Regions:
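C-terminal hydrophobic helical "lid"/dimerization subdomain
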Residues: 209, 254, 300-349
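Glycine-rich phosphate-binding loop and adjacent beta-alpha segment
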Residues: 250-312, 349
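NAD(P)H dinucleotide-binding glycine-rich loop of Rossmann-like/cofactor-binding domains
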Residues: 85-162
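Mid-domain Rossmann-like dinucleotide-binding core that forms the NAD(H)/NADP(H) cofactor-binding site
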Residues: 74, 130-204
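Adenosine-nucleotide cofactor-binding segment
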Residues: 161-164, 176-255
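N-terminal glycine-rich cofactor-binding segment
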Residues: 3-20, 33-63, 78, 92-105
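Glycine-rich beta-strand-centered segment in the early N-terminal region that forms part
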Residues: 20-31, 45-87, 120, 126-129
Length: 349
């Protein structure tokens, strides 16, 4: 079968590789390029030694299935890239995203077919209604839902998302859908225009300029139907009580701890390397009761909730996907994503 192989930093090659020998095989119809894929391509990654097949945000058709597993050849499915064990201490405490005994899909999905272990089918494979690239967003949205779970959202909450990459954009869409006033800080004018076209206020870093949303002012929640309060026309210190850091720059964490309102929350969503140290404003933590929280990955409950949300609000989430490429143009797709011109790219075998 054809596969897009990561063969070294800055190197991707379309190669013939052996087909999976599993009893359960999914024919891949689409797989999203995630931030980890891009980072691996640009800088390498300790978990992916070349040659390796990257990609884990995929959906497709069941090509082969064991009798009695609940699936038949031709079934439409989306696959969770991993599942927690459900029995360890962190799982029992409800933090399945941190499980040390996760079960993983066998190999990446930038290829024509993916094999699924028999003992993973019940946990990690899910029926879907139709074949659509929107299902590549289930895993990213699951991670965002885990982030939401770390927040103490109130009817009066106001959120600022720092970074309008695909994950930041998902945060912004979900805040808006829940009726929570939200703004986005993003240096790319093209991405600000995109965000603004969705009715979300988008600002340049520093707050000097912004793009007027066509629906600036009061807005209606897509999920509740309630009309919520207006957004500001500029980024104002102390206005937002929630700041989502969706860019992996440690200085932004330090900056927004000082920026959020009293009793506000800063969520570190984008990961930093293990050797990076973040400077914390102790005054804000103690005297202003600002909370700093982190969010990593998802638990299966988030994946299931994300799937339900996407099937209920398909058109809203499809806005995230801006480009698709055939697998043979995978290197061009990665370069497009690196340029910042695309938001979310799907590769199709």
């Amino acid at each position: 079968m054809k596969a897009l192989l990561y063969t070294g930093i800055g190197q991707l090659e379309l190669k013939d590789v052996p087909e999976p020998s599993s009893d359960f095989i999914v024919k891949v119809l689409g797989c999203g390029i995630c931030g980890t894929d891009l980072k691996t391509y640009q800088k390498g990654h300790h978990l992916f030694s070349p040659p390796a097949i990257l990609g884990h945000e995929f959906y497709g058709l069941v090509e082969k299935a064991p009798i009695g597993c609940g699936y038949l050849a031709g079934d439409k499915v989306v696959v969770a890239p991993y599942a927690e064990c459900g029995f360890c201490d962190v799982c029992i405490r409800g933090a399945g995203s941190l499980c040390a005994n996760k079960h993983y899909v066998e190999g990446g999905a930038f290829c024509e077919k993916v094999g699924i272990a028999s003992d993973y089918i019940e946990q990690g494979v899910f029926h879907i209604k139709e074949l659509d690239d929107v299902y590549t967003l289930v895993e990213p949205l699951a991670c965002v839902l885990n982030g939401f779970e770390q927040l103490d959202l109130k009817p009066t909450s106001r959120a600022l998302v720092v970074g309008a990459g695909p994950m930041g954009a998902l945060f912004a869409l979900l805040f808006r859908a829940k009726g929570i006033p939200v703004g986005v800080v993003e240096p790319s004018a093209q991405r600000r225009e995109k965000i603004a076209s969705w009715g979300i206020e988008a600002f340049e870093p520093g707050g000097a300029g912004h793009v007027e949303s066509p629906r600036a002012g009061r807005m209606e929640s897509a999920l509740t139907g309630q009309v919520e309060s207006a957004r500001p026309s500029r980024v104002e210190k102390g206005f937002y009580d929630i700041a989502i850091i969706a860019v992996n720059k440690k200085e932004l964490v330090s900056e927004y701890i000082k920026f959020v309102a009293d009793a506000g929350t800063v969520l570190m969503f984008s990961g930093l390397s293990s050797d990076e140290i973040v400077a914390i404003d102790a005054y804000s933590i103690h005297y202003r009761q600002v909370s700093l929280k982190g969010s990593f990955g998802y638990a299966l409950r988030h994946f299931k909730e994300a799937l339900s949300l996407i099937e209920a609000h398909k058109e809203m989430f499809l806005k995230i996907i801006t480009h698709n490429y055939p697998l043979e143009l995978g290197k061009e797709a990665f370069e497009m994503l690196a340029s910042g011109e695309a938001l979310k790219i799907v590769l199709r075998p």
